[in-house]
Amino acid sequence: MRYLFAVIANRTGEVLADHDEMAAIDSFNEKIEAAGQRIMAAGIATPDQAVVFDFRGTRDSITHGTVVDSDLFMAGFWIIEAEKDTVAHALAAEASKACNRPIEVRPFLR
């Protein structure tokens, strides 16, 4: 089963990983890559660089900025493969420790 691990950052904190965090993230990535659990991972731009397109029905809207105004935002993600929730949750704990940020876990819909 696939899971999204969203890396949660705070606008008032450091968004980019420091040298030690990057080393820990690289080590975690190597571990899950070797185990065949890493599908992909990436850091993403801050919400001020987001653009929302809404062309549903008769709408014709392009808005700069994110859809949610919050101090918390997704700063990166992993997509991982795990046999069951307990394995994914254990990996999420490791990911959180590696990047020194909270991780929100969501399973993919089947």
Language model segments and positions:
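Conserved, structured core segments of small domains
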Residues: 1-110
